[in-house]
Amino acid sequence: MSGEGTDLPTFQSSRTADGDVINRPGSSQQQLVPIAHTISSPSKAYQKDTAMWSPPLSSHPIMSPPDLTPQHPVFSTEDLTRPAAGLRRRPSVPPPRRYSNGDYDPKLSFTSDTGRALRAREDLYYSDRERENSMSSRTRARDDHPHPDYHERSRPPRTYRNVVGWESGPQKSYFDDSSRSDLGKDRDLEKGMREAGAAPEWASGEKVRRKSTDESIDGYNYESHKRNGTKGTIDLNNLTPEERAMVLRLPWTQWMNSNFKNHFVATIGEFVGTTMFLFFAFAGTQVANIDSNTVNTTTGAATGFNIAVQLYIAVIFGFSLMVNVWIFFRISGGLFNPAVTLGMVLVGAIPIPRAACLFFAQILGGIAASGMVLGLFPTTFNVRTTLGASTSTVQGVFIEAILTAELVFTIFMLAKEKHKATFIAPVGIGLALFIAEMVGVYYTGGSLNPARSFGPCVVSGSFDKEHWIYWIGPITGTFIAVFFYKFIKMLEYEMANPGQDGDAKNDPTQNEKKREQILEERNRRYEKRNGSLRPGSRLS
């Protein structure tokens, strides 16, 4: 090198002073090469083609390249056989606090002309394509699972500009975005219809408003398209099966969510339940009275006393009521008795409109059951109720009243009052009717139910002169039961012997809310009695 008299170009980084790229020996694998070895022998680091260029003879002294050997060998993992693409990232140092405002970014890699450290930019904007090409196709997820977001692209074009008549612009948006500062001016804020070539409306600086108050937010004037004086009609013949089903379902859906529908369902359930209850009861009575000497009656002096007949009738009435109440109490409450319905209204368990519907259903159910027994069984129709064994009218009224009071009060305590045994209330109700029939069948026929006595009289066409006691007696018994029920409620019977069979929701010793409700009712009655609370008002 020193023996030659030629001038060598000055060595600067990876290029010569003339701008020629240094040729390095080719290698397909990355290798750990000391940087010191790379730059220590510039005479072997590159070779010039003598046919194309030869150093001229000159008297300039030979300049040796600067000694760039580091103090400690530094190894690099880069492939030195090919030039690095883009700028090579250098280790960042914490910038001065005045530049980063106290936040240190460990990814600082660039420096501006002023010497200020710049933050690193993500590879999303500056993609190293050489690095991508060097990667195997199997290691790139974008080749195995192509997705539109993997491809670099510029701003998507406004496709509607490729359509004829795009100058009219889209329909105006729902909201006015012209006042938003985060929207760039290059965003298309065309609202409404504008002429071809006209400037967008946001450029004028005026706030876009609706053309009229009749125009809706979606740009459609519903008022101008309304039919004057006529109602909108739908041609069912021009609808698809799905549209036809939807149109026909609208009135049905509205009706299904109404109280009228609920009353209708309860009425139907009460009619069917009363019919089934009295049908089995009448059929059993018909069987028990086959050998009776008195026609069209279940009791009478000529009938005589037969313990088997009395027991059979009591059992069939009690079990028929128990089974059918258990079936229908979820639908209508399973009352099957106008006297019980009246009692439920007086204690506030059911509203008056529901009670009226149930009353007519019970009367019709008694008539239907009587007609079924009359038409199905070949024996003489013998299920009517009359006084017997020298029973007076007054005695008959009070016998019916007391027996009915016992039945109605049983229903209040087992069904109306909620407790652990509420779900087996039909058993207790059926047993209550059973013991009442055991007492009353011989003397009054054991009616306890105006519908039970009214139905057979209608079917047979014969009304006895004492038929009225089967209305007055049960109604009187209902008032007796209601009075006693309200009396013990006023005395707070729940607090007298708590914890017997009350559940966690209704026992005041277990539920503090229930206890507060009882105390609030006590205070309300006290204030009402002292005149501080007007009758009919509620305690807030």
Curated annotation (Swiss-Prot):
Q: Which residues lie on this side of the membrane: Cytoplasmic?
A: 1-263, 330-332, 378-393, 442-467
State the UniProt keywords alphabetically.
Answer: Glycoprotein, Membrane, Repeat, Transmembrane, Transmembrane helix, Transport
* Subcellular localization(s) per the UniProt record: Membrane
Catalysis performed (reactions):
H2O(in) = H2O(out)
Question: Which Pfam families does the record associate with it?
Answer: MIP
- Region Disordered: start-end pairs: 1-224, 499-540
Q: What is its main location?
A: membrane
Can you list the GO cellular component terms from the UniProt entry? Answer: plasma membrane
Cite the GO molecular-function annotations of the record: water channel activity
Task: Specify residue ranges for compositional bias: Basic and acidic residues.
Answer: 119-133, 140-155, 174-194, 204-214, 502-530
Extracellular topology: which positions? 285-308, 354-356, 415-420, 489-540
- Stretches with biased composition (Polar residues): 25-44
The induction annotation reads: Expression is higher in vegetative hyphae than in conidia and infection structures.
Q: Which SUPFAM superfamilies match?
A: Aquaporin-like
Got any disulfides in this one, which pairs? Answer: none
InterPro entries associated with the record: Aquaporin-like, Aquaporin_transptr, MIP
TM spans, by residue? 264-284, 309-329, 333-353, 357-377, 394-414, 421-441, 468-488
The record gives the membrane topology as: Multi-pass membrane protein
Sugar-bearing residues? N296, N530
Q: Which domain of life is it from?
A: Eukaryota
Q: From which residue to which does the signal peptide run? A: none
Per the record, the domain comment is: Aquaporins contain two tandem repeats each containing three membrane-spanning domains and a pore-forming loop with the signature motif Asn-Pro-Ala (NPA).
What this chain does, per the entry, is described as:
Water channel required to facilitate the transport of water across membranes. May play a role in the vegetative growth.
Q: Which family does it belong to?
A: Belongs to the MIP/aquaporin (TC 1.A.8) family.
Record's protein name:
Aquaporin-5
